[in-house]
């Protein structure tokens, strides 16, 4: 259970966009109590995580804009919604 479980609950990568691609990386470490979110390698969120669940709203893209919602819950996989539809991790 060790590494596989830890990776599933603390790190996730998603690719969004049809013509304008973006990669969203989420690192939510419940033991060190921080959340870091990067878009295309640039850190956009770096906050302490002191509660069991958090939601972050972002707008991503230039020509192709997307409303992104990131849901982080303790001991659960990270969920990402883009324009109301769930995105699968890469």
Regions found by a protein language model. Give the residues of each.
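Cysteine-centric segments in proteins
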Residues: 1-90
């Amino acid at each position: 259970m060790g590494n596989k479980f830890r990776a599933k609950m603390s790190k996730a990568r998603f690719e969004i966009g049809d013509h304008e691609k973006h990669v969203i990386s989420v690192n939510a470490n419940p033991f060190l109590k921080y959340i870091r979110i990067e878009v295309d390698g640039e850190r956009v969120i770096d906050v302490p995580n002191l509660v069991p669940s958090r939601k972050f709203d972002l707008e991503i893209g230039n020509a192709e804009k997307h409303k992104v919602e990131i849901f982080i819950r303790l001991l659960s996989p990270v969920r990402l919604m883009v324009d109301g539809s769930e995105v699968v991790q890469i």
